[in-house]
Design a protein with these regions (language model features):
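Aromatic "clamp/platform" in nucleotide-sugar-dependent glycosyltransferases that forms part
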Residues: 240
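Short alpha-helical donor nucleotide-sugar binding micro-motif in glycosyltransferases
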Residues: 220, 227-232
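A short, well-ordered alpha-helix in the C-terminal region of glycosyltransferases
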Residues: 286, 293, 300-315, 321-327
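Carbohydrate-associated surface elements
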Residues: 124, 144
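Membrane-proximal helix-turn-helix segments that form the acceptor-binding/catalytic region
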Residues: 98-118
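Conserved donor-binding/catalytic core segment of Leloir-type glycosyltransferases
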Residues: 161-179, 185-189
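Short hydrophobic beta-strand element within catalytic cores of glycosyltransferases
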Residues: 257-260
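Conserved acidic donor-binding segment of nucleotide-sugar-dependent glycosyltransferases
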Residues: 219, 272-273, 277-284, 293-298
Length: 334
């Protein structure tokens, strides 16, 4: 089977998803061509189709924002990563974002109309697809991560010097309001100088966090990222909307407990009380309380980390994701 994954470069976890999906398909003995178009086509996707002809394939797979632009006689699989039109997220969107998302809504609607199959990264997104777009036939395929790369180990390299007496938190991803980055300084102020938060800027610079106990590591390479996951004590994500939570799954795979928001897809990853704690959305005090509870109990952190590693290997690997997509592909070419 020949698969082409074609989409506009997103500068986010969507690009990681595309790369992991392509690698998984190849490992399963099929051909896969990965074609990421320039981000400029995000605003006008159609010219991306003519820029470079799609190789002859059995399946074309793309994300919902761009997929309609690549439709031809080949079966088209469309993946919805997260529904930005979710009413629960509306209070956090800026006026420019709302205008841009109106355009994206039209693009997504076209993609679903021409799709031969639609997949979602989590059950929450599948429900929102039904509510917002009236699309009721989506397949659930959880995103997979490389559990052999993201694994527990004792780092030998030192990307950043960390004082031994501090409890180290880690936030990975773009520093956006959707990810709850604006809450990080407030949470760290509550926690005080006994805690240190390491953040990455992801592939987009995002918000500037001015706080003495927050260190921005910038964009990290994969080996550095795995090191930081393993050097932290707790992974923190006060996100307001996730279609899956790639960095959460990576931290879990490295055997770390997670403190996350009880919203969108996050309860599908983090089992409250077993793999970490889920907090009320935007509740800085709740986040600080849960973090302090974990910081004071090393055995609990270890137990939750072991639970999370096992959970990832059972549910969120590249191979399991690949098997899900291959099932969808095979239904279309029988």
């Amino acid at each position: 089977m020949k698969i082409t994954i074609r989409q506009v470069r997103g500068g986010s976890g969507v690009d990681v998803w595309a790369d992991n999906t392509c690698r998984g398909i190849r490992r399963s003995g099929h051909e896969c061509n990965l074609d990421l178009c320039s981000g400029v086509y995000q605003f006008v996707p159609m010219p991306a189709y003519f820029k470079k002809k799609i190789p002859r394939s059995d399946i074309i797979h793309s994300n919902s924002w761009n997929a309609f632009a690549f439709k031809n006689e080949t079966p088209l699989v469309v993946t919805e990563h997260h529904v930005v039109h979710d009413p629960a997220y509306d209070p956090y969107r800026t006026v420019p974002q709302k205008a841009f998302h109106r355009w994206i809504y039209r693009c997504e609607k076209k993609s679903f109309e021409v799709a031969d199959a639609v997949t979602c990264d989590c059950e929450y997104t599948r429900k929102k697809l039904e509510e917002v777009f009236g699309y009721f036939n989506a397949h659930l395929v959880y995103v997979g991560i490389d559990e052999s790369l993201f694994r527990p180990f004792t780092p030998e390299k030192v990307t950043v010097d960390i004082p031994g007496a501090k409890t180290v938190l880690f936030f990975g991803g773009n520093l956006s309001r959707r990810k709850g980055a604006d809450l990080l300084p407030m949470i760290m102020k509550k926690l005080g100088d006994d805690f240190l938060l390491l953040v990455t800027s992801g592939q987009k610079q995002g918000l500037v966090l001015g706080s003495s106990n927050i260190v921005n590591l910038g964009r990290l390479m994969s080996d550095q990222l795995v090191e930081i996951y393993n050097r932290c004590d707790i992974f923190l994500t006060p996100s307001r909307l996730e279609g899956f939570g790639l960095s959460v799954a990576e931290a879990m795979s490295c055997g770390k407990p997670v403190v996350a928001t009880n919203c969108s897809s996050l309860p599908e990853l983090v089992v409250d009380g077993k793999g970490g704690f889920l907090c009320r959305i935007d509740d800085v005090n709740d986040f600080a309380e849960k973090i302090r509870h974990l910081a004071a109990d090393e055995n609990l952190r270890w137990e939750m980390g072991v639970f999370n590693r096992k959970r990832v290997k059972e549910k969120f690997t590249i191979q399991k994701m690949t098997n899900g997509y291959l099932d969808v592909y095979n239904q279309l070419i029988r």
